[in-house]
């Protein structure tokens, strides 16, 4: 059988982690519709909706034949979508793909059921838990590295394996699917159960995604530093009164529910399906509507704020009331999309660099910060509330400057050293379990930003459009939480806070929400 190529060292590391129940991909959902007008959120719990049944126009729904026709066109042009991993740990093409190999259909009897389970176009929690905790890929199984859930003929949920689909690939899948969906004829929908047959294509004419982690150095253009400057006092006044003055509980000392598994020895394949692990914790999705998001973007643009640094700053400030000991460290793991730098556009595959930004909790320690703040500002404010507001602003400024400066230093190092820099070596060779053991006082927070990937397409009223999106990745120790966000023109910014069930972070979620609002 013809193979594409062996797995690279980094891809082998990822597959090993997957087999050891340490990760299980990314789930990215999008709602497709031909109408941009959405029902008022207040209508979804009405009696009429409760009693109503699903009754949209046939041509505006993603029927199974329509999905099959779109997938047939898409799969044959994207080798990543008909690839698997054999027992020799090589990527190879599948001989055939059936609809049942990929597509899982979920239907609800009423619109009420649909809205309760899939409000704002995000996947229901039970689906996330099933996909992350119950589905596993085994090399040599002749199974694809992705699957698709179709909910109520409107919501498509893509689940891609980490070995071939990074978070940006998950977003790009929907971009590619939408393009093919709007190019097919409305009268040629396929009832064929066969989506792909290797005999119908010429493999030599297709390019399978290469591994960039074992390649030569990559030189990137220099970037302008994005440093956070002083923010308006009224902005922080609202944050202070609505969040930090409220009483909070404390972070529990429990560890994740994920079982402790040695990464030095692979499990037997027949044990994998019976493993009791939790790669899906508590997920909270929220929407920043366009009006609010545009306001926040205006602040970002005016003050030269890096959005990732801004989110890191929010996370640190919202964690402050939960921290007992400020001698520890928060490490933000931030994947950076390399496709534009490599001229790969909206391609599938693994084309990212992960940065790890260490933020000492001392940056948000009031005792240390107050002395620095008074020394630097000569502020002798008598009003405690106003002083605390300005102190929080000072801490937020420090965190954002620290994160931005670190990111810029790492990108400059990468521009100079290419794939021989420390971050790439860490991605390829470091053992994450060793990191957890050696840094027991350190917690990881994933910042997953795909907001720069546009999922909109210019089209007429007869074209399908993506009207809402949401995503998250699997989570395990030593990750405290992940913050994943994506942007859709119709809905706005969708943010998912994902944390292990053993952590009590409801107060953090409330604080984060108030901060954004």
Curated annotation (Swiss-Prot):
Pfam families: AATase (PF07247)
Domain of life: Eukaryota
GO molecular function annotation: N-acetyltransferase activity
InterPro entries in UniProt: Alcohol_O-acetyltransferase, Atf2/Sli1-like
Assembly mode: Interacts with PDR17/PSTB2 and SCS2.
Functional summary from the UniProt entry: Phosphatidic acid-binding protein involved in interorganelle phosphatidylserine (PtdSer) transport. Linkks a PtdSer donor membrane (via binding of SCS2 and phosphatidic acid present in the donor membrane) with an acceptor membrane (via its interaction with PDR17), forming a zone of apposition that facilitates PtdSer transfer.
This protein's name: PSTB2-interacting protein 1
Species in which this protein is naturally found: Saccharomyces cerevisiae (strain ATCC 204508 / S288c)
């Amino acid at each position: 059988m013809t193979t594409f190529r062996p797995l690279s060292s980094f891809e082998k590391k990822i597959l090993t982690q997957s087999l050891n129940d340490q990760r299980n991909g990314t789930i990215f959902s999008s709602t497709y519709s031909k109408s941009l007008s959405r029902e008022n959120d207040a209508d979804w719990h009405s009696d009429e909706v409760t009693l109503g049944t699903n009754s949209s126009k046939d041509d505006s729904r993603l029927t199974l034949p329509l999905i099959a026709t779109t997938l047939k066109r898409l799969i044959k042009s994207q080798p990543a979508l008909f690839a698997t991993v054999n027992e020799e740990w090589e990527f190879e093409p599948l001989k055939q793909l059936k609809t049942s190999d990929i597509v899982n259909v979920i239907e609800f009897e009423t619109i009420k059921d649909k809205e309760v389970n899939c409000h704002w176009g995000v996947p229901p929690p039970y689906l996330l838990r099933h996909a992350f905790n119950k589905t596993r890929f085994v090399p040599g199984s002749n199974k694809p590295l992705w699957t698709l859930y179709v909910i109520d003929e409107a919501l498509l949920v893509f689940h891609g394996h980490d070995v071939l689909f990074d978070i940006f690939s998950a977003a790009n899948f929907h971009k590619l699917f939408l393009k093919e969906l709007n190019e097919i004829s409305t009268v040629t929908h396929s009832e064929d159960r066969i989506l792909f047959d290797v005999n119908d294509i010429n493999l030599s004419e297709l390019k399978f995604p290469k591994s960039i982690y074992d390649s030569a150095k990559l030189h990137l253009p220099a970037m302008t530093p994005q440093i956070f400057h002083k923010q308006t006092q009224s902005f922080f006044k609202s944050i202070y009164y609505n969040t930090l003055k409220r009483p909070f509980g404390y972070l529990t000392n429990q560890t994740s529910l994920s079982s402790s598994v040695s990464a030095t020895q692979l499990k037997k394949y027949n044990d994998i399906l019976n493993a009791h692990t939790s790669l899906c914790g508590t997920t909270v999705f929220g929407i920043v509507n366009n009006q609010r998001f545009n306001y926040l973007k205006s602040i970002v643009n005016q003050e030269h704020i890096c959005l990732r640094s801004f989110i890191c700053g929010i996370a640190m400030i919202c964690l402050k009331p939960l921290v007992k000991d400020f001698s520890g460290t928060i490490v933000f793991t931030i994947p950076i999309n390399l496709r534009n730098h490599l001229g790969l556009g909206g391609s599938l595959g693994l084309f990212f660099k992960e940065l790890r930004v260490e933020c000492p909790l001392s940056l948000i320690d009031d005792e240390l910060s107050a002395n620095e703040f008074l020394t630097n500002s000569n502020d002798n404010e008598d009003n405690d509330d106003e002083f605390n507001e300005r102190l929080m602003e000072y801490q937020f400024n420090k965190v954002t400057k620290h994160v931005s400066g670190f990111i810029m230093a790492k990108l400059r190092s990468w521009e100079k050293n290419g794939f021989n820099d420390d971050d790439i070596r860490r991605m390829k060779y470091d053992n994450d379990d060793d990191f957890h053991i050696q840094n027991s006082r350190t917690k990881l927070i994933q910042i997953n930003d795909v907001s720069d990937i546009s999922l909109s397409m210019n089209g007429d009223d007869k074209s399908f459009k993506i009207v809402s999106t949401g995503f998250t990745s699997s989570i395990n120790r030593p990750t405290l939480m992940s913050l994943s966000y994506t942007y859709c023109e119709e809905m706005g910014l969708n943010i998912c806070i994902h944390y292990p069930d053993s952590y009590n972070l409801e107060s953090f979620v409330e604080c984060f929400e108030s901060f954004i609002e």
